[in-house]
Amino acid sequence: MKILVDENMPYARDLFSRLGEVTAVPGRPIPVAQLADADALMVRSVTKVNESLLAGKPIKFVGTATAGTDHVDEAWLKQAGIGFSAAPGCNAIAVVEYVFSSLLMLAERDGFSLHERTVGIVGVGNVGRRLQARLEALGIKTLLCDPPRADRGDEGDFRSLDELVQHADILTFHTPLFKDGPYKTLHLADEKLIRSLKPGAILINACRGAVVDNTALLTCLSEGQKLSVVLDVWEGEPELNVELLKKVDIGTPHIAGYTLEGKARGTTQVFEAYSKFIGHEQHVALDTLLPAPEFGRITLHGPLDQPTLKRLVHLVYDVRRDDAPLRKVAGIPGEFDKLRKNYLERREWSSLYVICDDASAASLLCKLGFNAVHHPAR
C-alpha cells in the first residue's frame, strides 16, 4: 500500500508507515507522476484536490490535515467512490491564540484595555466558540454572528452582521469560504462593510483570504480610513497584494493555525480516519508525539492583569515574529510558501507551566488554556 503525505505534515511519515509505504511530497504542486500507483493521499490546504488531479488515478482515500475543506471537491470524491476525512478543530486553539497575540500587541501599542472593547465574532464554529469562551473568561464582551447556526436553532445569542458592524470595536472572521448559496462568505467583508466599521476599529481575518475583499480593503486604507487590520490570509495565495501588506498593521503568511500541537492533531486525526477506513483502526495519544516545550515552568507573582497576560502570551508566541519575515520577502515568487514550509516551531499556551501564588490568577490562566497551578507564597 502506497501512501503519499504532504512533506510539511509533522509525524506523518512515522504514523502512516505503520499502515504502508510512505512517500513525502510537496503540496504545491503535487508531483502528478507519484499519483499513478498511490492508494491514499494526505494533504494540507495548499493542495487543490479535484477531478483534474485524481481522475483515472488509483487513489482510494484522501485526507486533509486541516479544519477547512474548501480546497477539496468533496462532491466529486463521493461520486468517484473515494473516501475522505478532514481534521475539524485541529488548529482552532492555535488560531484563537494568534488572535490574542495580535490583540494584545495592538492594545499595548495603542494604549487601550481589551475590557473597554466589544469583540464581534463572525463564524462561531470550532474557532469562534473557543475565542468567545476565552474572551468572556476575561470579562470581555462578545457579539456573535453565524446565520447557518442561527437558522438551525443552535444555542447562542446570534446577531446580524450589520449589528456587529455597528457595535463591535473588533471584528474577527472565522468562517468557511462559501462562494455562493444562501450563506455565501465570498467578500463577506466588502467595501460597504469596511466603510461602515466604527472609527478606530480592528479588523481581523484568520480564516480564508477571500472572505475579505482585499481590493476594497486597500482602497479604504489608502483613502485614510482609521482602521487597524490583521491579515493572516490573502486573496490569491500564495500571491498577495504587496501594497495591502504595507497598509495592514499585522500581516502573516497563513500560519495562524500553525502550532506544533495543531499540526499534530491534524495528522493524527486523518491517520486515525484512514486506519479505520482500511480496517486497521488505531488511536494515537498526542502527548506521546510532542517534544518537551522550550520553557519548562515559570513563576507568576500576584494577580493577572493585561500587561502580565501579554507577557505570558508573547513568551509562548509573539505574532510580530511572523509579520517581519513576510514583509521582507513579499512579492518574491515562492517565498510565501517557503515561509510556511520552513516555519519555526510554535507551541500553544498549554505547553507553559505557570506556578501562581494567586489562586484567582491560576484559575483564570487555566480557563484561558495555560497549564497553571496555585502554590501559595510562603
From Swiss-Prot:
Binding-site positions, substrate: S45, T66, Y258
UniProt-annotated catalytic positions: R208, E237, H254 (proton donor)
Main localisation: cytoplasm
CDD domains: ErythrP_dh
Record SUPFAM superfamilies: Formate/glycerate dehydrogenase catalytic domain-like, NAD(P)-binding Rossmann-fold domains
EC number: 1.1.1.290
GO cellular component, one term: cytosol
Catalysed reactions, as listed in the record: 4-phospho-D-erythronate + NAD(+) = (R)-3-hydroxy-2-oxo-4-phosphooxybutanoate + NADH + H(+)
InterPro entries tied to this protein: D-isomer_2_OHA_DH_cat_dom (IPR006139), D-isomer_DH_CS (IPR029753), D-isomer_DH_CS1 (IPR029752), D-isomer_DH_NAD-bd (IPR006140), Erythronate-4-P_DHase (IPR020921), Erythronate-4-P_DHase_dimer (IPR024531), NAD(P)-bd_dom_sf (IPR036291), PdxB_dimer_sf (IPR038251)
Residues annotated for NAD(+) binding in this entry: D146, T175, D232, G257
Cellular compartments annotated: Cytoplasm
One GO MF term attached to the UniProt entry: NAD binding
The organism's place on the tree of life at top rank: Bacteria
One Pfam family it belongs to: 2-Hacid_dh
GO biological process, one term: pyridoxine biosynthetic process
Assembly and oligomerization: Homodimer.
Family annotation (HAMAP family): PdxB (MF_01825)
Function of the protein: Catalyzes the oxidation of erythronate-4-phosphate to 3-hydroxy-2-oxo-4-phosphonooxybutanoate.
Name of this protein: Erythronate-4-phosphate dehydrogenase
Lineage summary: Bacteria, Pseudomonadati, Pseudomonadota, Gammaproteobacteria, Enterobacterales
Gene designation per UniProt: pdxB
